[in-house]
Amino acid sequence: MPFKKLSRRTFLTASSALAFLHTPFARALPARQSVNINDYNPHDWIASFKQAFSEGQTVVVPAGLVCDNINTGIFIPPGKTLHILGSLRGNGRGRFVLQDGSQVTGEDGGSMHNITLDVRGSDCTIKGLTMSGFGPVTQIYIGGKNKRVMRNLIIDNLTVSHANYAILRQGFHNQIIGANITNCKFSDLQGDAIEWNVAINDRDILISDHVIERINCTNGKINWGIGIGLAGSTYDNNYPEDQAVKNFVVANITGSDCRQLIHVENGKHFVIRNIKARNITPDFSKKAGIDNATVAIYGCDNFVIDNIEMINSAGMLIGYGVIKGKYLSIPQNFRVNDIQLDNTHLAYKLRGIQISAGNAVSFVALTNIEMKRASLELHNKPQHFFMRNINVMQESSVGPALSMNFDMRKDVRGVFMAKKETLLSLANVHAVNEKGQSSVDIDRINHHIVNVEKINFRLPELRE
């Protein structure tokens, strides 16, 4: 019952209705469509929310109202909605738990501070909120230790700032089938904007249309401070499906002022496309132990990276799956297309594009790449390697514009070299220094088939 004083008349009327309350008809009365939390006890918001959810389908926090001291867990019943126009505040220990069909929505600046939304059901929606606070590890947590299948998660139109992590998924114990995380702005975070960790059971994940700014871990935490990160479990060069994060798309991301924008470990069957990056440099998250790159891929199979525009930024790292110094896997079967990297006005050297690829049956295709004041470095040997429409310029004082290091025979990583039916195909590939002179370093060519057309350098003599 709403928190209001009862007059003697109201009290007598209520008392006369007590017998009626025990009838089956009374017990079957549906919850009201909407209740206002302002009608409940303001001295105990925890109890008030629990009562409100028992009485209404939607609990509304009206504009101008601040509900503070939300410092414990509150379960939103299945199918019910928390709609926020005012503000909810806690000390970091409070959370709202979403069950099947639960929704938390915001409007007109509706906000949450130091409170976690804990997703534990299917058909959940979180949208329209402003979220902040360094109290909890993350603003939205998706996971838990119970085995369950969660379907059709929607997270949309959030503004998250001045927090640790924004969205954290721990996926080892459960499964998500279908998640759309869209149209959010993440800024001034210590941790990741989105971390999808050990998500080996998930599929059909869309992460798109986000703005990510100023991700800078200064608290000494290791591996914090990435824009968007997805990871499977243990690296394995056979790329088993049940150990990889898979079947996802990351698209339409605008990012700036962070150390690493997009990160994938042990993934397969994915697409990264339409990325615009500015100022992705080592000036951020200096002690977090993460590589500086706009896109960092480790030990992945069967993927596409398409339409990446980078300015004054570290470029791309596509490298081995490594644990404690042991090389466990190498990237294979991928295409990198429509890449622009312009570091013309950058005051210092940063990574250009570094690619390690291999395995006995594998392919790599690099197409439509333009790089200014940056290097393209290729390591190890995939079975079939294609390069088309490549233009690279790097200053001679820094090093060659294009490096091809195929000969790994004396390197422990040589175990990943393709050796049978190998193909190298180059067409319209130009690598120059600032004077327009050829700037290429190639160690050894021993591919079974070599096709070359319109390149501005000579290949080493073929060797057996």
From Swiss-Prot:
NCBIfam families: PRK10123.1, WcaM. InterPro entries: Colanic_acid_synth_WcaM, Pectin_lyas_fold, Pectin_lyase_fold/virulence. The lineage of its organism: Bacteria, Pseudomonadati, Pseudomonadota, Gammaproteobacteria, Enterobacterales. Pathway: Slime biogenesis; slime polysaccharide biosynthesis. The gene is wcaM. Exported by the Tat system. The position of the signal peptide cleavage has not been experimentally proven. Disulfide bonds: none annotated. SUPFAM superfamilies: Pectin lyase-like. Residues 1-28 form the signal peptide. This is Colanic acid biosynthesis protein WcaM. The keyword Electron transport does not apply. The keyword Repressor does not apply. It comes from the Bacteria. Keywords: Lipopolysaccharide biosynthesis, Signal.
